[in-house]
Swiss-Prot record:
NCBIfam families: apaH (TIGR00668), PRK00166.1 (NF001204)
Annotated SUPFAM superfamilies: Metallo-dependent phosphatases
Enzyme kind, highest EC tier: hydrolase
Name this protein carries in UniProt: Bis(5'-nucleosyl)-tetraphosphatase, symmetrical
Native source species: Serratia proteamaculans (strain 568)
Record keyword Metal-binding present: no
InterPro entries referenced in this protein's UniProt entry, alphabetically: ApaH, Calcineurin-like_PHP_ApaH, Metallo-depent_PP-like
Family membership noted in the UniProt record: Belongs to the Ap4A hydrolase family.
Key words of the record: Hydrolase
UniProt key word Hydrolase: yes
Purpose: Hydrolyzes diadenosine 5',5'''-P1,P4-tetraphosphate to yield ADP.
EC number per UniProt: 3.6.1.41
Transmembrane residue ranges: none
Length: 283
């Protein structure tokens, strides 16, 4: 059995299948971890969801900000943007089944045996592992409930951007969602900055990538994340691994086999690229 971790797929179905073929992935024996943002931007969001769902317990995934946006579009809360290329998914005969499956997926994965923690954007330096798990469970509970459209309608927004155990209600859920699915930069005290999307090294002072601040998550855990394509999988400290390498922008789809720490990549299909080149900061 092998554990494979893959960065943001973003609807790049052909690349996903080709990448898994490189290692003869066997869902009967192997486990596949996905950093979220399965959908949008690439041409095959519908096929990606159908395939990942078909893998059943062989998959451990987390939701990303684009996955949440898809839920909001399907619920009539947000508008469908042509650049997301999700219309075939929205109009599919099995759309209801796929959406209801998707909204019941977690926003955080923790494996105590492998000592792996995975969230789409990472783990805010203001959280220890117990707080991250608690806040993730709260988001997951509302997403899987009948009142999930109310949450989706309220999740958009950048405030509050500073963690406090006293946060409650929709404000607490919004902070948790932003920390788990949208975070990139923080102020030195750990407060989230939800504005800057610049590549590392070009962000204005005093902002720092979240992973450069002291962490409260125990050092025994490795944090796996996606979301930040302009990192190109580089520049993170020991114990933090970024796997989004911008496949939908012309980069690669990247996979890590955990047991031997071997990386595999699959280049983007040039014919499937979005108009424009490397707009990674917008992802």
């Amino acid at each position: 059995m092998s554990t494979y971790l893959i960065g943001d797929v973003h609807g790049c179905f052909d690349e996903l299948k080709s990448l898994l073929a490189q290692v003869a992935f066997d869902p009967q024996q192997d486990q596949l971890w996905l950093t979220g943002d399965l959908v949008a931007r690439g041409p095959g969001s519908l096929d990606v969801l159908r395939y990942v769902r078909s893998l059943g317990p062989a998959v451990r995934m987390v939701l990303g900000n684009h996955d949440l946006h898809l839920l909001a579009v399907y619920a009539g809360i947000s508008r469908n943007k042509p650049k997301d290329r999700i219309t075939p998914l929205l109009e599919a005969p099995d759309a209801d089944e796929l959406i209801n499956w998707l909204r019941r997926q977690p926003v955080l994965q923790v494996d105590e045996q492998l000592k792996l923690v995975m969230a789409h954007a990472g783990i805010t330096p203001q959280w220890d592992i117990e707080t991250a798990q608690l806040c993730a469970r709260e988001v997951e509970a509302v997403l899987s409930s009948d009142s999930y459209p109310l949450f989706l309608d309220a999740m958009y927004g950048d405030m509050p951007n500073n963690w406090s155990p006293e946060l409650s209600g929709l404000a607490r859920l919004r902070f948790s969602t932003n920390a788990l699915t949208r975070m990139r930069y923080c102020f030195p005290n750990g407060q989230l900055d939800m504005i800057c999307k610049d590549a590392p090294g070009t962000a204005p002072a005093p902002l720092k990538p979240w992973f450069e601040l002291p962490r409260l998550v125990d050092a025994d855990y490795t944090i796996i994340f996606g979301h930040w394509a302009s990192l190109e999988g580089r520049g993170t400290p020991a114990g933090v691994i970024g796997l989004d390498t911008g496949c939908c922008w012309g980069g690669d789809l990247t996979m890590l086999r955990w047991e031997d720490q071997q990386y595999f990549t699959q280049p983007a299909n040039r014919r499937d690229l979005l108009d424009g080149v490397h707009q990674q900061a917008a992802s």
